[in-house]
Design a protein with these regions (language model features):
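N-terminal export leaders
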Residues: 1-3
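Bacterial N-terminal signal peptides
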Residues: 5-15
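Short, contiguous, pocket-lining structural segments
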Residues: 165, 169, 190-197, 213-225, ...
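Active-site-adjacent structural elements in folded domains
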Residues: 95-96, 184, 188, 206-217, ...
Length: 394
């Protein structure tokens, strides 16, 4: 299949057998100028993986991802001792270079894949492949498929389960790989190697002590564990893990995280209740977007008392539309930066026939230059995601 023809076909593949609906058809021309402007800039940037950033405080090696817990600071009463926690206050001295490199990957590869799907121009797919080879294949630069040393805390631990959330940025990368592969833009041999990396990482998420610790977290961390395993299982064709994630969504996430009014009490209890509520809702919506099928539609699933995604969206949408109505505390940091173009509005609006949510999504800011916002807005290329139920991703 020629590259241009393959890219044109991707739109139909993403839309499912019935073809794209009116909103999906309107999305591609809406996104085209934004996507191409970004992708053209990214063509000038060469891949850079974690091996370019030595981490002196890491207990691991040069291929091991390392980060330090955001909210941990030196103890004034014991300056050389273990750090202490200050919830919601990020320590600017902590090591974040590996996270920044991963976020850069998650910004650039999906944009390049989206540009390829819109235009059929091989240069976009080829540059995306350069990044993918550097991160997941090349022996000299690849990242090891674990987060054993993520979110370390000085004087306390060399890594912990909480760090698993750092790889939420691989969710849209996995999607980009799938889109490129469906259109024949990733050679079979490369795809096998990329799949192998994600298969090994999924195994680590599911079996390691740190992975299991994050799985059992009761708030957005537990949500993001399911989202990641779902996305990576989708890429690798692991139907058993996909089904496990569907079951966990219905039996763990919705019952333990969602209140009767559609709020997330564990997020409201944090020092950034608005931002965390948006973040968790986007993660829940992304799980549904990845895993919902005609026979097991997570979008319409609800508990006997009515708790489900419809209620969660109905709770949060008014406060996205008019933040001044938010009745809870203001976020201690970055409060003025939210809301952004939240994926939950688009995904849920399309899946649950909430056109006002889709219209609202179109009015919101798509991109930010604020690092913390980029970090917490992990779905940035809707062209890669929109499809009717029952499509090859749905």
């Amino acid at each position: 299949m020629k590259v241009a023809a393959a890219a044109v076909a991707i739109g139909a593949l993403l839309a499912g057998a019935s073809g794209p609906g009116p909103e999906e058809r309107g999305l591609r021309p809406l996104e085209r100028p934004r996507v191409l402007a970004a992708a053209n800039a990214y063509l000038e940037r060469q891949p850079q993986t974690i091996t370019a950033f030595p981490a002196a405080r890491s207990a691991g090696g040069p291929h091991d991802f390392f980060s330090e817990g955001d909210y941990w600071w030196p103890n004034p009463a014991d300056p050389g001792g273990p750090y202490i926690r200050r919830d919601g206050e990020s320590n600017p001295q902590n090591f974040v270079e590996h996270r920044r490199a991963l976020i850069r990957l998650s910004v650039e590869v999906p944009a390049l894949a989206a540009a390829w799907s819109l235009t059929g121009r091989a240069q976009y797919a080829e540059h995306a492949r350069r990044h993918l080879r550097a991160w997941f294949i090349a022996p000299e630069s690849r990242m090891n498929p674990s987060l054993q040393y993520a979110q370390a805390i000085h004087g306390i631990t060399t890594g912990r389960g909480t760090g698993v959330i750092d790889t939420i940025h691989l969710v849209e990368v996995a999607r980009a790989v799938e889109v490129l592969r469906l259109g024949g833009a990733v050679p079979a041999a490369e795809f096998v190697e990329i799949q192998r990396w994600f298969r090994e990482y999924t195994r680590w998420l599911v079996t390691s002590p740190n992975g299991r610790e994050e799985r059992d977290a009761k708030n957005n961390h537990g949500t993001c564990w399911v989202m990641q395993v779902a996305a990576f299982a989708r890429l690798t064709g692991d139907r058993a893990q996909e089904q496990m994630c569907r079951t966990r969504f219905k039996t763990v996430l919705v019952p333990t995280e969602l209140a009767a009014d559609g709020s997330f009490p564990l997020e409201l209890a944090r020092t950034k209740p608005y931002g965390y509520s948006l973040f968790n809702l986007d993660a829940m919506a992304t799980i549904c977007q990845i895993l919902a099928t005609a026979s097991d539609n997570l979008w319409t699933f609800s508990l006997p008392d009515g708790r489900g995604m419809g209620r969660a969206l109905a709770f949060m949408a008014p406060y996205i539309r008019d933040k001044s109505r938010w009745p809870y505390a203001r976020d201690v940091e970055y409060d003025d930066e939210w809301p952004m173009r939240q994926a939950s509005l688009l995904f849920g609006g399309l899946a649950l026939n909430r056109p006002d949510d889709v219209a609202l999504w179109k009015t919101l800011k798509a991109d930010s230059s604020v690092d913390e916002v980029v970090r917490n807005l992990f779905i940035r290329q809707p062209v890669l995601w929109t499809q009717a139920p029952g499509g090859p991703f749905g």
